[in-house]
Amino acid sequence: MRQNRRASMIVNRILITLIVLVSLSFLFLRAGPKFSEADRACIQDEWQENKSLNVSSEINNETYQIVFADVQKEFKWIFLPKEISGNPDILMIVSSNRDNFARRNVIRKSWMNSDKNKIVAEKRMKILFLVGVNSENEKENTVVLKEAEVFGDIIVVDLEDNYQNLPYKSLTILLYGQSKTAESVKLIGKIDEDVIFYPDQLTPLINDGTINMSISAIYGEKWNAGVEVSNKDETNKWFIPKYSFKCQLLPSYLSGPFYLTTRKAAERILKSTKHRKFISVEDVFITGLLAGDVGVEKKQLPSMYMYDETTTDTAKAEILAWHNFKNNAEFLESWENLRLSRCKACRKSRNFRGSRSQLDEERNQ
């Protein structure tokens, strides 16, 4: 028995050490090489005036345009949810893949559920999904449109879902938040569907001024200026060709799986797109280059884990958002269990309910 306990303690220590080492390595990477005035000047030189181009905006109630210096595209709002009721301060939009119905249901049962999240129950936060469809695949599109009609929580646009189109999709999120919602919405959140998120953790951050919804700012996990550009290996997911961006180092930016943009910042970013050539690396492009061009402040939030390895289910630190690679059952179980132990604002919430029996019920549905 003692040997088992001792072995368990050793394993736990090893795990803690590994987490610390991984965290330190990410901090080192976030710092990057020294970012000089020459690097800053290079980024500024890449900016283009382009007075003849329109800004990214709605064309009419059915179509909108995303405009870059070298490419301009029009898209259609295929399905829009009914007008948002109440006066929410926050709009969270989940960037969701068309065929991922099961994951959308997991999110509806967890952090989107008004029975388990006070900020949602009080209608201070509205949550929607954004799904892109290929107009040529009518059969799959019919399924998505039926889901949108039944649940009323999906924005559908004619945008093919792939990595290259992520900047268009994320800018669509900002455009919807800026043009399709009441003025009460002051914060527009972009979140990927593989992020465990605790909405009630935002309340104390807003109350203590960590998040200021009245300024032009973007909040998330911040990477400092100086990360090297990947411009040599075309097979690299984060490859940026030199004809799109010639500089060697990147400005500061926020991790793409989760970030919060104030309405003022969203309006500025949308106006700035026409001054830059298209880059497919969404977080660098939108939260780094475009946000930087128009003076949007980039701010670090606490309790952010945007890499799966930076925390575990057995760690103790608070969680606001955790980007991970769990399957649907694991995602739901972790969300429920960590709500009990690593979400202080959840434990204080009057809407908090015993989740273990509830989890069993949901598994059997």
UniProtKB/Swiss-Prot annotation:
Q: Enumerate the Gene Ontology biological process terms.
A: protein O-linked glycosylation
Enzyme Commission identifier(s): 2.4.1.-
Q: What is its main location?
A: Golgi
Q: Which residues lie on this side of the membrane: Lumenal?
A: 30-365
InterPro entries under this entry? Glyco_trans_31
Listed transmembrane segments: 9-29
Answer whether the UniProt record assigns the keyword Electron transport to this protein: no
Q: Which family does it belong to?
A: Belongs to the glycosyltransferase 31 family.
Instruction: Name the chain's protein.
Output: Beta-1,3-galactosyltransferase bre-2
Q: Which organism is it from?
A: Caenorhabditis briggsae
